[in-house]
Amino acid sequence: MAGAAAAVASGISIRPVAAPKISRAPRSRSVVRAAVSIDEKAYTVQKSEEIFNAAKELMPGGVNSPVRAFKSVGGQPIVFDSVKGSHMWDVDGNEYIDYVGSWGPAIIGHADDKVNAALIETLKKGTSFGAPCALENVLAQMVISAVPSIEMVRFVNSGTEACMGALRLVRAFTGREKILKFEGCYHGHADSFLVKAGSGVATLGLPDSPGVPKGATVGTLTAPYNDADAVKKLFEDNKGEIAAVFLEPVVGNAGFIPPQPAFLNALREVTKQDGALLVFDEVMTGFRLAYGGAQEYFGITPDVTTLGKIIGGGLPVGAYGGRKDIMEMVAPAGPMYQAGTLSGNPLAMTAGIHTLKRLMEPGTYEYLDKVTGELVRGILDVGAKTGHEMCGGHIRGMFGFFFAGGPVHNFDDAKKSDTAKFGRFHRGMLGEGVYLAPSQFEAGFTSLAHTTQDIEKTVEAAEKVLRWI
């Protein structure tokens, strides 16, 4: 428990909860029948089922991103029709409190009126120019002003693209080929990163992916997250050969796993000593833990940063940036080639600008911390009350919990979680009108639109479901 105490001391809420096992009554007939509903109330996902079955004939697995298929939690994938604020409605008319937030972008709430109004005005002028637009300058300046490591930025269309660009950049700048990443960290689906990856790869139980040639990953070294000694050993064994260390400063794609107090400092020191670069993948944490991202929150400045999600306000976007001398390697300023047809399109720039404007308002991150803390404390408390071994934590608007005693410091710890129990919990919460990420190995997100009432309803639902499972 010393690790948990240290995490709390550094401003991170980690609460392992152990409770004795208790006997439970047999499941009710309604639960067995509905698989997602605890009560005899009307809860149907018939239209979702019909649409999803049709989708499976049209798209691989019926989805365009694997985790949406509910493979790891079971039950019927939900087809959504509309969103607003902190709530979502499916095609059957069911309403849910949302803690996925489109996997992170919806930090100010879904379908924000001001963002939508700005998008309508931009839309009147066109959706994409394939040429420079003034809005790129505005968002670029906002990003550069906010993120400590970024002196120049390149916009792309996804977090995966951002990490692909950053990977090529660090190799071009250093003249080295090897990279070091951490087990369970996900940096998109580029070949070089699909080694002991998290996110959907973890959900499917695949250590990597067929179709990735050995040559693509021969230069990818891996270490356990939060293990500075393992990193130092890899640098000793590969002296002068590692181009960069890539990491999620707070892991979100193996569940929510914060760094130990000295870990990020150790990475900064070892990379500087060896002439390697430090890359923070802030696609998830950027503008969520603080306006300047995890690097502002922890006070550690990397050399290169990747961004996505929030900076597009819900539209497809990504970015990578860093020191000016590094970024000037990127074409057309330098020889490292990277391009994109829709990069910097006016719609994504508009949504990003107006989302960041909202995040600049006083009290934003204090509010996120308040509601998220209430949520996590509430769920862990009812977990203990109902006899479940659970642990979890949060930083500002990012959170997670595991059905394990904890503490969870790395991917191996995360894999000790009872994923079958999480699946039952997830299905039960759907029946109670709460939408959580359909995988134990994904972080959750709150927004400025979440209310105390949302949190109270969620905790009440969690207690009900936990008593069932």
Curated annotation (Swiss-Prot):
Keywords: Chlorophyll biosynthesis, Chloroplast, Isomerase, Plastid, Porphyrin biosynthesis, Pyridoxal phosphate, Transit peptide. GO terms for cellular component: chloroplast. Residues 1-34 form a transit peptide. Its cofactor is pyridoxal 5'-phosphate. Pathway: Porphyrin-containing compound metabolism; protoporphyrin-IX biosynthesis; 5-aminolevulinate from L-glutamyl-tRNA(Glu): step 2/2; Porphyrin-containing compound metabolism; chlorophyll biosynthesis. Its EC number is 5.4.3.8. The modification N6-(pyridoxal phosphate)lysine is found at K309. Homodimer. Belongs to the class-III pyridoxal-phosphate-dependent aminotransferase family. HemL subfamily. It comes from Hordeum vulgare (Barley). It comes from the Eukaryota. The keyword Kinase does not apply. This is Glutamate-1-semialdehyde 2,1-aminomutase, chloroplastic. It is found in: Plastid, Chloroplast. The lineage of its organism: Eukaryota, Viridiplantae, Streptophyta, Embryophyta, Tracheophyta. It catalyses: (S)-4-amino-5-oxopentanoate = 5-aminolevulinate. PANTHER family: GLUTAMATE-1-SEMIALDEHYDE 2,1-AMINOMUTASE, GLUTAMATE-1-SEMIALDEHYDE 2,1-AMINOMUTASE 1, CHLOROPLASTIC-RELATED.
